[in-house]
Curated annotation (Swiss-Prot):
GO terms for molecular function: S-adenosylmethionine:tRNA ribosyltransferase-isomerase activity. Transfers and isomerizes the ribose moiety from AdoMet to the 7-aminomethyl group of 7-deazaguanine (preQ1-tRNA) to give epoxyqueuosine (oQ-tRNA). Its EC number is 2.4.99.17. Pfam families: Queuosine_synth. Belongs to the QueA family. Monomer. This is S-adenosylmethionine:tRNA ribosyltransferase-isomerase. It catalyses: 7-aminomethyl-7-carbaguanosine(34) in tRNA + S-adenosyl-L-methionine = epoxyqueuosine(34) in tRNA + adenine + L-methionine + 2 H(+). It is an enzyme of class 2 (transferase). Keywords: Cytoplasm, Queuosine biosynthesis, S-adenosyl-L-methionine, Transferase. GO terms for biological process: queuosine biosynthetic process; tRNA wobble guanine modification. It comes from Alkalilimnicola ehrlichii (strain ATCC BAA-1101 / DSM 17681 / MLHE-1).
Length: 345
C-alpha cells in the first residue's frame, strides 16, 4: 500500500470556498459500495434513500472559534490555533510565528487578551490565559472560526453559523464534522417523520484531521488523538435498529471512527476517552452499514477510510465521476451517500 494509491486529479476550481446558499442545496453522489454503480441526486433525496428501520448517527460536537491573532513582545506577529482546552484557563495549541516563542513569553492577542507560553509538547504548545474569563468565553468573544487551510480566505461572520452543524451542542472541535453541515432542521424533521431514528456521538475533531501523511506507506502513519463519547443510549439505539433489520447510517467519518472505536470487540459498547484509530483498506467494519460523507483530499486519511468502506477503486472511480460532473469538494462542498444498493434506490 502506498499513499499515491489514493491520489486523484482535482481542478482548483472545484474546491468550495463558500457554503451553498442553503444547507440542503448540496448535490449528493450515491455510490453502491458493492458494485461501484453511481447516481447523481440532490441532498434532500437522502430522506427517500433512508428506510424507516434505519438509525442515523450524528456527531454533536461544536466548533469553537479556535484561531487567535496577536503579537509577541518583540512585535512579531503570531497566530494561535487552539487544539483543545486543558482546563478553564489553559490550552494546547499550535503556534505560527517567524520564530517560535520560548516558555515564559507572554503573547498579546486580539481584544488585549494575554496568554503565557508555559511549555511545549512536540508540535503543540501549552498556553495559560491570564484573564478571569474561561478559555471558551475568551474564544467566543475574540476568536475566529478555524476554516481549513484549503479555504483560502479570511473567516467572515457567516462562518460562525455555516461552519457549524444545526445540532452542534458540545464545544470542543477545531474543525467541523462537515457531513453534518448539509442538514437543516426541516430536513431532520422529514427524516424523523419517515420513521428513521436518530442517535448521537461526540468526537471533538482536531486540527490533525488536515495533517498530510509524511510516510509513503500509510500503515506506518500514526494518527492524532481525539476525544470521543459514545453514550449508552446510542449503543441501545444501534442494538434496536439491528434487531429490526435496519442499517446504522453514519453521518461523517468522525461518526465512523467513534463507532468503530467503541466496537473493536465486535458489538458497540459505551466509550468515553481518546481514540487514535486509523481506518484504511483491510479494516473489518463492525458498527456501520452506510455512510454520508463529503469529498476528501487526495492522499488523506479520510479518503483511506472511505476506501476501506467501499473499496479503493470504486471510490476513486466515483471521485473521477464527481470531477467530471463538477461536484464541489471538501468542507463546504457536496456529499456522498455510500451503501449497498445506494445507486438503485
Amino acid at each position: 500500500m502506498h499513499v499515491d494509491d489514493f491520489s486523484f486529479d482535482l481542478p482548483e476550481a472545484l474546491i468550495a470556498h463558500h457554503p451553498p446558499e442553503q444547507r440542503r442545496d448540496s448535490r449528493l453522489l450515491c455510490l453502491d459500495r458493492d458494485t461501484g454503480a453511481v447516481a447523481d441526486r440532490r441532498f434532500p433525496d437522502l430522506v427517500d434513500l433512508l428506510r424507516p428501520e434505519d438509525l442515523l448517527v450524528l456527531n454533536d460536537t461544536r466548533v469553537i472559534p479556535a484561531r487567535l491573532f496577536g503579537h509577541k513582545p518583540t512585535g512579531g506577529r503570531v497566530e494561535v490555533l487552539v487544539e483543545r482546552p486543558l482546563d478553564r484557563h489553559r490550552v494546547l495549541a499550535r503556534l505560527r510565528a517567524s520564530k517560535v516563542p520560548a516558555p515564559g513569553t507572554v503573547l498579546t492577542l486580539e481584544g488585549g487578551v494575554a496568554a503565557e507560553v508555559t511549555g511545549r509538547e512536540g508540535e503543540f504548545f501549552t498556553l495559560r490565559f491570564t484573564a478571569e474569563q474561561t478559555v471558551l468565553e475568551l474564544l467566543e468573544h475574540h476568536g475566529h472560526m478555524p476554516l481549513p487551510p484549503y479555504i483560502r480566505r479570511a473567516d467572515v461572520a457567516a462562518d460562525r453559523e455555516r461552519y457549524q452543524t444545526v445540532f452542534a451542542r458540545r464545544p470542543g472541535a477545531v474543525a467541523a464534522p462537515t457531513a453534518g453541515l448539509h442538514f437543516d432542521n426541516e430536513l431532520l424533521a422529514r427524516i424523523g417523520a419517515r420513521g428513521v431514528d436518530t442517535a448521537w456521538v461526540t468526537l471533538h475533531v482536531g486540527s490533525g484531521t488536515f495533517a498530510p501523511l509524511r510516510v509513503s506507506d500509510p500503515r506506518e502513519h500514526r494518527m492524532h488523538s481525539e476525544w470521543l463519547d459514545v453514550p449508552p443510549a446510542t449503543c441501545a439505539a444501534i442494538e434496536r435498529a439491528r434487531g429490526r433489520g435496519g442499517r446504522v447510517v453514519a453521518v461523517g467519518t468522525t461518526v465512523v471512527r467513534a463507532l468503530e472505536t467503541a466496537a473493536q470487540d465486535g458489538a458497540v459498547q459505551p466509550y468515553q476517552g481518546e481514540t487514535d484509530i486509523f481506518i484504511y483498506p483491510g479494516h473489518r467494519f463492525h458498527a456501520v452499514d452506510a455512510l454520508v460523507t463529503n469529498f476528501h483530499l487526495p492522499g488523506s486519511t479520510l479518503l483511506m477510510l472511505v476506501s476501506a468502506f467501499a473499496g479503493r477503486e470504486r471510490v476513486l472511480a466515483a471521485y473521477r465521476h464527481a470531477v467530471a460532473q463538477r461536484y464541489r469538494f471538501f468542507s463546504y462542498g457536496d456529499a456522498m451517500f455510500i451503501a449497498a444498493g445506494a445507486a438503485d434506490e
